[in-house]
């Protein structure tokens, strides 16, 4: 196993190769011109746990934890929407306590049928957006 090393960091070279590939995938995804082409790419690359039919994906990025995201049918996702499947608040609390007492909070997100999610919204862990819903922009 080859490793890259400097004075403070040792990293497996296969990890570096994987990180470079993921970075290039994200750059490529950002440059896909239409929402429908982005949906087709997400399906082809199997980036989400579930991606239904007639989905409009306007954001120029996809979540790192995509396997925790289910999007059902007839869903429109506007620009700059972010799906966050985890947080890092445990890092703050652990720093206050001086020892590791809190664990990382990780959850899934599910968006049911006939949903519109407005621009700039952030959907947090363990949220299920029910059918026939509108999520206001910036919420």
Identify the meaning behind each predicted range.
Residues 55-56, 135:
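Hydrophobic, membrane-inserted alpha-helices
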Residues 1-48, 90, 132:
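Terminal amphipathic alpha-helical/low-complexity segments used for targeting or macromolecular assembly
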Residues 132-139:
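Short, intrinsically disordered, charge-balanced linker/junction segments flanking boundaries
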Residues 14, 44, 70-72, 139:
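Intrinsically disordered, low-complexity boundary segments flanking structured domains
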Residues 38-39, 56-129:
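Flexible, glycine/small-residue-enriched loop-and-beta-strand segment within the central core
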Residues 51-53:
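Cytochrome P450 catalytic-domain "roof"
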Residues 49, 115-117, 135:
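Generic detector of intrinsically disordered, low-complexity, polar/charged segments
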């Amino acid at each position: 196993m080859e490793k890259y090393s400097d004075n403070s960091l040792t990293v497996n070279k296969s990890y570096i190769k994987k990180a470079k590939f993921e970075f290039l995938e994200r750059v490529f995804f950002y440059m896909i011109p239409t929402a429908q082409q982005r949906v087709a790419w997400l399906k082809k690359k199997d980036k989400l746990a579930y991606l239904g039919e007639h989905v409009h994906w306007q954001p120029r990025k996809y979540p790192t934890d995509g396997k925790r995201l289910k999007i059902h049918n007839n869903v429109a996702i506007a620009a700059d929407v972010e799906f966050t499947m985890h947080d890092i608040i445990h890092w703050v609390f652990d720093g206050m306590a001086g020892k590791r007492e809190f664990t990382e909070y990780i959850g899934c997100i599910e968006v049911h049928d006939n949903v519109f999610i407005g621009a700039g919204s952030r959907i947090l862990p363990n949220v299920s957006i029910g059918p026939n819903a509108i999520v206001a922009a910036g919420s």
